Amino acid sequence: MASAANSSREQLRKFLNKECLWVLSDASTPQMKVYTATTAVSAVYVPQIAGPPKTYMNVTLIVLKPKKKPTYVTVYINGTLATVARPEVLFTKAVQGPHSLTLMYFGVFSDAVGEAVPVEIRGNPVVTCTDLTTAHVFTTSTAVKTVEELQDITPSEIIPLGRGGAWYAEGALYMFFVNMDMLMCCPNMPTFPSLTHFINLLTRCDNGECVTCYGAGAHVNILRGWTEDDSPGTSGTCPCLLPCTALNNDYVPITGHRALLGLMFKPEDAPFVVGLRFNPPKMHPDMSRVLQGVLANGKEVPCTAQPWTLLRFSDLYSRAMLYNCQVLKRQVLHSY
């Protein structure tokens, strides 16, 4: 029994280290620090939680430092006590930038013998900016312009995400974005101008509860530090989104937002594109390798690559996008 308990606690420690980004709570005091983290349902760590299943994992962390004793932590997940333990080390680092996030590393847990177990005191996350914007992405990402910049990545480590222009490789998220100069020329651009978002707007169905088109019940926003019970769990920006018509088909019809086609095809082709056809999802800095347009007569026309740049996300935002989504976790974070 002790061995099983230790194994479960070690899994919890790894979950806290590998699937959580933290936000300080206003319940904190000089004697007690309280943090919260919200993350999509884990594909690895499955705790015993009271009550019905949730589509999110809300974590409350209470850090106490008794006089003349080492620090100990109390962890609640979705309101259920997960552990009271003394970490061998506890490193914290505030993330510079607009999101009020804190990185943490928990060393090996041991029993916190004789310590009081505080009740869950959540308070409210102290947050400033709760959205990942285009400006955040552009100022922290690296443009990938040549095949040579990708040649050091082991091919087997490249994981395609969705069907249109997103990959995860060796700890980083790669996505196509509209070039900055095009954004300045097009003020009505979608707020998150990734190729995956364009494809989603162009081809999604009209059922807002569709999991594949809208991500219903599969997403959180880690930047908020907490997910409410009534959250629909949808996303407009996650690269997991793909039209439900593409689940078993390389061809998908255009269903709306036709004005976006002007940034994907030549002016003489864009008005007549009625569908998209996806190519095999090999990562390449040329957007035209991802898909092509299909005209009413069945003819295929190439995409225009010039308005698009492949971006390698920063470690922080790669983690944020990954932790937001059950689907991405199952694809990328299925063991540790």
UniProtKB/Swiss-Prot annotation:
Domain of life the protein comes from: Viruses
Record Pfam families: Herpes_UL16
Keyword Ubl conjugation recorded: no
Tagged with keyword Transferase: no
Subcellular localization, as worded in the UniProt entry: Virion tegument; Host cytoplasm; Host nucleus; Host Golgi apparatus, Host trans-Golgi network
Region of interest called Interaction with host BBLF1, as start-end residue ranges on this chain: 67-69
GO biological process: symbiont-mediated perturbation of host cell cycle G1/S transition checkpoint; symbiont-mediated suppression of host JAK-STAT cascade via inhibition of host TYK2 activity; symbiont-mediated suppression of host JAK-STAT cascade via inhibition of STAT1 activity; symbiont-mediated suppression of host JAK-STAT cascade via inhibition of STAT2 activity; symbiont-mediated suppression of host type I interferon-mediated signaling pathway
Keywords: G1/S host cell cycle checkpoint dysregulation by virus, Host cytoplasm, Host Golgi apparatus, Host nucleus, Host-virus interaction, Inhibition of host innate immune response by virus, Inhibition of host interferon signaling pathway by virus, Inhibition of host STAT1 by virus, Inhibition of host STAT2 by virus, Inhibition of host TYK2 by virus, Interferon antiviral system evasion, Late protein, Modulation of host cell cycle by virus, Viral immunoevasion, Virion, Virion tegument
InterPro entries: Herpes_UL16/UL94 (IPR004286)
GO cellular component, one term: viral tegument
Function text: Plays a critical role in cytoplasmic virus egress. Participates in the final step of tegumentation and envelope acquisition within the host cytoplasm by directly interacting with the capsid. Upon virion binding to target cell, a signaling cascade is triggered to disrupt the interaction with the capsid, thereby preparing capsid uncoating. Activates the AP-1 pathway and enhances EBV reactivation and virus release.
Name recorded for this polypeptide: Cytoplasmic envelopment protein 2
